[in-house]
Amino acid sequence: MTTVITRLYADEKTACDIARQLKSEGIPKRALKVVVADGKKGAALAEALKSAGVHPSAAAGYAERVAGGLPLVAKVNYKPLGAAKLVRAITARARWSRSRTQPKSSPVRTHLK
């Protein structure tokens, strides 16, 4: 089963640094995607998130938050063994972006697809 783990970061550099660290730990590059707003709003941003693997029912909610940060999306399965746990551990070390509903130290919930 694939697990989609999403995290919001305050800036693109932080999100890309985390993606590089995950890649160096064995997470395949194809499983990592940093989605940037790049002027996209609403439905276009939700579509970008869906194409990155975010479940359609969650994409609209995340699209609203992308304006305040950049989500790192990691689609992981059982290879390498313990990949989901590794992604959670590495992303937990970084600072999350502020949002209206989440404290800075709290991750956005993981969604299964």
From Swiss-Prot:
Seems to be required for the LH-II stabilization. Keywords: Antenna complex. It comes from Rhodobacter capsulatus. The gene is pucD. GO terms for cellular component: light-harvesting complex. This is Protein PucD.
